[in-house]
UniProtKB/Swiss-Prot annotation:
Gene source species: Xenopus tropicalis (Western clawed frog)
Gene name tied to this protein: alyref
Family matches, as PROSITE patterns: RRM
Extent of Basic residues compositional bias: 220-232
GO function terms (MF aspect): C5-methylcytidine-containing RNA reader activity; RNA binding
Disulphide bond pairs: none
Compositionally biased residues, Gly residues: 24-62
Classification of source organism: Eukaryota, Metazoa, Chordata, Craniata, Vertebrata
Record-given protein name: THO complex subunit 4
Length: 260
């Protein structure tokens, strides 16, 4: 030690290099440390491969031991579960069977009645067509303000009853208007076009009270005519002046203008 204290730093470095063993390098030292220090943890996780590997490597550097992952004794839940038994045949849930035979489609016979009087109600239609068979629906079409459109739907449970009612009542007047009855043959709802009202003047209607009288247009026209005739008869007709009388009036007017 006393010799090294008197030596310079460069001489000490040269001496240390000359005394170092030839077979030992930096890698070997690290390998030994890696085998001893990291061998314990590697043995607990991966089966004790870290210590032996570090010593055998020598100058090759440390070798990291990787844990071996096993699934022993750990049951993981499946991401999804399949049904035990799948149906042999796929079937749409909106249809019962067959193509185009939906459960929501209507059956039976449906009539479209048009050219109805605006006073015909749902009860009148039901009472009129109920004698031919069981009705599913019988209703008059109304607009948003509650006025009748002059058309109605009559839906029978059986198509034969609808045909019988159409043959019996097609063209028959109801409250003075002949009913126009058509059989709706497609599932598409028939286009509802309100028929223009016929002229009420000059016709005789049958009120539901049983009395027969003129329509409102005739009554209004009659009152207007009476008032017109009364006012015309009370006035005196204008007297027509002759040419001589007109000349005399003109001369009198001119004379008054001259004097003024």
């Amino acid at each position: 030690m006393g010799d090294k204290m008197d030596m310079s730093l460069d001489d000490i470095i040269k001496l240390n290099r000359s005394q170092r063993p030839a077979g030992r390098g930096r890698g070997g030292g690290r390998g030994a440390r890696g085998g001893s220090a990291r061998g314990g943890a590697g043995g607990r996780i991966g089966g004790g491969r870290g210590g032996g590997g570090g010593g055998a490597a020598g100058g090759g550097g440390p070798m990291r031991s990787r844990p071996v992952l096993t699934r022993g004794g750990r049951n993981r839940p499946a991401p999804y579960s399949r049904p035990k038994q799948l149906p042999d045949k796929w079937q749409h849930d909106l249809f019962d069977s067959g193509f185009g035979t939906g459960a929501g489609m209507e059956t039976g016979g449906k009539l479209l009645v048009s050219n109805l009087d605006f006073g015909v109600s749902d009860a009148d239609i039901q009472e009129l067509f109920a004698e031919f068979g069981t009705l599913k629906k019988a209703a008059v079409h109304y607009d948003r303000s509650g006025r009748s459109l002059g058309t109605a739907d009559v839906h029978f449970e059986r198509k034969a009853d609808a045909l019988k009612a159409m043959k019996q009542y097609n063209g028959v007047p109801l409250d003075g208007r002949p009913m126009n009855i058509q059989l709706v043959t497609s599932q598409i709802e028939a286009q509802r076009r309100p028929i223009q009202s016929q002229s009420r003047g000059g016709g005789i209607t049958r009120p539901r009270g049983g009395a027969i009288g003129f329509s409102g247009a005739n009554r209004r026209g009659g009152r207007g005519g009476n008032r017109g005739r009364g006012r015309g008869a009370g006035r005196n007709p204008k007297q027509q002046l002759s040419a001589e009388e007109l000349d005399a009036q003109l001369d009198a007017y001119n004379a008054r203008m001259d004097t003024s």
